[in-house]
């Protein structure tokens, strides 16, 4: 299904960050009951129709567009390459955009109704931002994460829930996802790790997106996760 099949609305606004960066928001046809903040937002924000087609709570998608420069994209999304660049983008993503969305659309969600999502390199962003802001993002939805950001030796005491997925035909990214699943589990986090037949690309991620949202916020979206890894619950301080 493409965006023409949605009865929701797409709103795009420009920001001054980095000389001009766009954010696209998918607004469901009825009042939102949950919100997903996403990196690579020029892509993920257009998947609202897939959520409408599934039996899911109405979910807003706030998609922050990527940099057109692939190197800068990696530096914004993965904290190890250029910490200053990452921190500037983190401030924009986690604070400026979130506050704008709350003011612009009047939707303020508790952590259990708020997720951060990413695919490939922006999957690293979702993990990094989720670990840094567990009292904002109650769930991390991460597909096919890159290998630039690896689990820290010492995990935060408060962890968001995490759903990780990768395709069986993208072994490098599958290995990255499994590494994170084990590390989060060992730190006491609640984790779902899913491996499905598929390769690295938009079609695979788009098919998985409603399943991620169903896991995070409830509802039915088809297949159940293949593996559930859990640890003791951790609360925010």
Model feature map: region roles:
Residues 1-237:
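Non-catalytic cap/lid and distal C-terminal segments of serine-dependent acyl enzymes
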């Amino acid at each position: 299904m493409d965006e023409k099949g949605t009865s929701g609305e797409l709103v795009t606004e420009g920001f001054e960050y980095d000389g001009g960066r766009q954010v696209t928001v998918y607004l469901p046809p009825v009042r939102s009951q949950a919100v997903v903040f996403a990196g690579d937002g020029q892509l993920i924000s257009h998947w609202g129709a897939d959520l409408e087609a599934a039996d899911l709570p109405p979910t807003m998608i706030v998609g922050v567009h990527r940099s057109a420069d692939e190197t800068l994209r990696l530096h914004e999304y993965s904290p190890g390459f250029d910490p200053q660049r990452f921190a500037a983008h983190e401030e924009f993503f986690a604070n400026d955009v979130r506050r704008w969305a709350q003011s612009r659309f009047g939707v303020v969600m508790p952590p259990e109704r708020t997720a951060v999502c990413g695919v490939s390199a922006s999957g690293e962003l979702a993990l990094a931002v989720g670990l840094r802001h567990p009292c904002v993002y109650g769930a991390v939805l991460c597909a096919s994460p890159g290998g630039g950001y690896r689990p820290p030796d010492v995990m935060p005491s408060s962890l968001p829930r995490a759903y990780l997925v990768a395709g069986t035909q993208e072994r490098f990214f599958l290995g990255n996802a499994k590494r994170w699943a084990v590390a989060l589990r060992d730190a006491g986090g609640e984790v779902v790790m899913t491996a499905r037949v598929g390769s690295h690309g938009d079609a695979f991620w788009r098919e998985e997106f409603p399943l991620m949202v169903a896991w995070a916020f409830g509802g039915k979206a088809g297949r159940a996760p293949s593996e559930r890894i859990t640890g003791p619950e951790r609360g925010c301080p």
